From Swiss-Prot:
InterPro entries (UniProt xref): CD20-like, MS4A
Regions of compositional bias (Low complexity) in chain numbering: 332-346
Domain of life: Eukaryota
Name this protein carries in UniProt: Membrane-spanning 4-domains subfamily A member 18
Family according to the record: Belongs to the MS4A family.
Membrane topology annotation: Multi-pass membrane protein
Matching PANTHER family: MEMBRANE-SPANNING 4-DOMAINS SUBFAMILY A MEMBER 18, MEMBRANE-SPANNING 4-DOMAINS SUBFAMILY A MS4A -RELATED
Sequence segments annotated as region (Disordered): 316-346
Location(s), subcellular: Membrane
Principal localisation: membrane
Biased composition (Polar residues): 319-331
Source organism (scientific name): Homo sapiens
Length: 398
């Protein structure tokens, strides 16, 4: 049986038929491959591949890598290469380090890099501050508006009712009709007194039944009464400043002025603390818990260097131990047999160098069977080229 030896670097002397398509390999065999054992082949690889062996790949960028540990920070010099067991891969990229082991993943980034996203390894670990506390409105101020509404609003409402009755009794005084003045002409004692009575009644009702509807109604009417009291103060001061008003009329207006001032103050106080109590009720059960989360420096899911979807991926990346350009199983130069592929027959569509699937020379099945004789005729030329380019392997048969 004649054995045919074809070099993978270049075969310029082969005479092939017209229907044979020759494809040059993308990664030529480095010079000196005849000195390697028959089971290992050396390739001219990119700077990111330090060493390629069967079942192992070590991919790293040549720069200093810092690794954080519990004891301290360890730095690795430029070009440092760690040895990993067969079946594992070590990928080192910028700005982090990916170290793959069987069943575990450890991602480490540069210390102090604030732009890198934080990462939990192996899971989220949070450390709560020792000063966890549950607070309400009473924690911020010593005054409780809800307690004020429950205890004091009833008294303030009763005072408002009395002030309103005082204004109404002043409005029905028959003496005022003989001496007309501004307070009487404006009708302030009547509509002011009614407003004060309504707001005071709602305040007393809100103290007994603090439902949202009643409380909101009481706050609204107290705001309206405050506006009426302010208007009444302005009317009374105007009446007291006129010179033609009689002394009796000024006495009546002067008697209403303190009540108007008191009503204005009471309605403002009740409205303010009523609104504050309503807002406090909405946030009464809110717990304020200051929590500090502590993370490991890198993120296994969202980091730019991701073991599954990141730019440096051991399964689908351009430098892959299974289907990348540096492939130990389906590369044009097969590493499992020998750097120089030896065939058992001149033309073999399955294991020979003229292979339509994995061989460096792409030949279709039909034309190869019809051109057996020309392929045998070029055996001597192939051997001559092999002698000039690549020295024959002592283990091959002649």
């Amino acid at each position: 049986m004649t054995e045919q030896v074809i070099g993978a670097n270049s075969v310029p002397g082969i005479i092939a038929p017209d229907n044979v398509h020759v494809i040059q390999p993308s990664n030529p065999v480095a010079s000196g491959n005849h000195l390697q054992p028959s089971e290992v082949t050396t390739y001219p690889i990119s700077p990111k591949v330090i060493h390629c062996d069967t079942g192992r790949a070590n991919l790293q960028n040549l720069l200093v890598v810092n690794q954080n540990s519990a004891a301290g920070v360890q730095s690795q010099p430029i070009g440092y290469q760690r040895q990993y067991p067969v079946g594992t891969a070590s990928l080192q990229t910028v700005p982090g380090v990916i170290q793959y082991t069987q069943g575990t993943t450890n991602l480490q980034t540069w210390p102090g890099d604030l732009q890198n996203p934080l990462n939990a390894n192996p899971g989220l670990t949070h450390t709560s501050n020792s000063s966890q506390w549950n607070t309400s409105f009473a924690s911020f101020t010593s005054f409780n508006p809800k307690k004020f509404i429950n205890e004091e609003v009833r008294t303030l409402g009763a005072i408002q009712i009395l002030i309103g009755l005082t204004h109404i009794f002043s409005a029905i005084n028959p003496v005022l009709y003989y001496y007309p003045f501004v307070t009487w002409l404006s009708g302030y004692p009547l509509w002011g007194g009614l407003s004060y009575i309504v707001s005071g009644s709602l305040s007393v009702w809100a103290a007994k039944d603090p439902s949202p509807c009643v409380v909101n109604s009481s706050i609204s009417f107290n705001i309206i009464s405050a506006l009426f009291a302010f208007a009444g103060i302005f009317i009374i001061i105007t009446d007291l400043s006129l010179y033609y008003v009689t002394t009796y009329s000024k006495a009546v207006s002067g008697g209403l002025l303190p009540f108007a001032l008191l009503e204005f103050i009471l309605t403002c106080v009740v409205s303010h603390f009523g609104c504050q109590a309503t807002c406090c009720r909405q946030f009464e059960n809110v717990a304020v818990i200051p929590t500090v989360f502590s993370f490991n420096p890198a993120n296994t899911t969202t980091s730019p260097v991701n073991a599954t979807t990141g730019p440096v991926n051991a399964a689908t990346g351009p430098v892959s131990a299974t289907n990348g350009p540096v492939n130990t199983t389906i590369h044009p130069v097969n590493t499992t047999t020998s750097p120089v592929n030896t065939t058992t027959s001149p033309v073999n569509v399955t294991t020979g160098p003229v292979n339509a699937n994995i061989g460096p020379v792409n030949v279709t099945t039909g034309p190869v069977n019809t051109t057996t004789a020309p392929a045998k005729a070029t055996t001597s030329c192939v051997n001559a080229i092999h002698t000039s380019n690549v020295p024959p392997n002592p283990r091959t048969k002649k």
